[in-house]
């Protein structure tokens, strides 16, 4: 496995590229079309366009080629400019324009120019409809879809196989499966072996609608299947949460390709089976298949979520060894993986090596700095993004507000929050409000936090009230906490956390009898409580623990070692469960309850399997509890080890008995 030092060694300077000077062009139409095809950027195309205008050879063919080329160069505005300044209004030019607008995601403009085509009296043909139908499938206008279908009949192109395929796809994607099936049924080609594509499109439509029975029925009825047929149905099962069925179908697949492997890897990652997602990726490599950018992004996502740094480094090494381009998708996935595995410097290095960054890339880096409490770097990165011309969206503001929250930068956080609406016309979501409530609460501004919750334009949810409750508890605002707890109960009286909040509130005031009443109510009404899990990667293998998990092969050794760790911590002042559990449980019961949290089990395995001085890295799906947080601090001081724990909210870097969060999380 490559080390980080090998992966991040300095690169040699790239070779300079020299472009030959422009050559004189003849006024021949075919010659200019050849020049248009040779253009690699918009500047070159503009140069050729200027010569065409000077020499007066802007025919319909040349105009259509100019529009097509500018679309391929991702310059739809230039395509529109060419069209507006050209007198050509024929099917060649309009088809090229509609196609280019569709391929550049200008769907509304594509439909508008189709309508303009009809108004100009230009007859649409079989090359027009597939792209305007695709645009409408993205827009989702059912009435327009039916009107376009009628137009295909009127213009006698409804029997064209490509038009029919586009109709089925459009109806399926706009949720009109009855119409999609009707067009499919009327297709005489569906019984031919070469009609696989229309079958795949319809099966995909039923998969998107979660109608796996109909999708499977169609799959079994196909005259012939290709890898796309298998991959479509596998993805349908994955998206429907039927991962076992997806795996069974994958095993039956005669020729597995990178698409089917990627679908399966992505499915395991999305359903939280990160170990299997990662192992499936390496199994694919052993079979001799080369991953594409989607495969790599999917497996890196699994590494990010589980903290599998070792596997992530191996994947990064594979990318370098095989000369895979560090595009936006792979680069962003690597940045996210390194940041979420606690290797911020590596994330920053990958980020700086990316030649092209989009909003997702910037957000991943800003969020990485933010969750590690690196406020100044997060804000600097945000400003660099603004200087680059990238416009912020609501997600990047979540990252910026997280940075302000984790560093208690109240005034700046409020400025960013106000700037969303005033400067960028972005309406804050519930998540933004929760962060601001947390920000005000952490600073002890309980009145302002409560007022914000009461006056929010969005109805506050449990998370919002819980953020306010934590602030009340931290700043001893018990009377306000009582009121907040009532709001929690009104929202969801059966939620276990609501009762626990009340218990803690009353226990802090010493009202033990009322606590007992609340606890009895809890026992009667609670149905289910989410269990926490933690991951720790050791020797390239992920180890997962759930709360109270005794399934690990080293369970006995872990239990003995955990007792030893807790005993040493108690000698140094650790008080198991104090101020964190319900007040009137016996001390030994408290230790039994709090001693089985998943992060404690992961920590203990880390001590058993790593050398002294090694940093222990743990990933937890829930917010770390106060008791475990306290133990981690004591253990980091006793063992002289760094403990890096990522919970549902942020990173906790325990070192010498202290935590980077400042004991507020």
Swiss-Prot record:
Gene (UniProt): PCMP-H64
Transmembrane segments: none
Lineage: Eukaryota, Viridiplantae, Streptophyta, Embryophyta, Tracheophyta
One Pfam family linked to the record: PPR_2
SUPFAM superfamilies reported in the protein's UniProt record: TPR-like
PPR repeats: 90-124, 125-155, 160-190, 195-229, 230-256, 257-291, 292-326, 327-357, 358-392, 393-423, 429-459
Residue ranges, annotated region (Type E(+) motif): 540-570
Claim: Repeat is one of the keywords in the record: yes
InterPro entries in the cross-refs: DYW_dom, Pentatricopeptide_rpt, PPR_At4g14850-like_plant, TPR-like_helical_dom_sf
MF annotations from Gene Ontology: RNA binding; zinc ion binding
Protein name per its UniProtKB record: Pentatricopeptide repeat-containing protein At1g04840
Keyword list, A-Z: Repeat
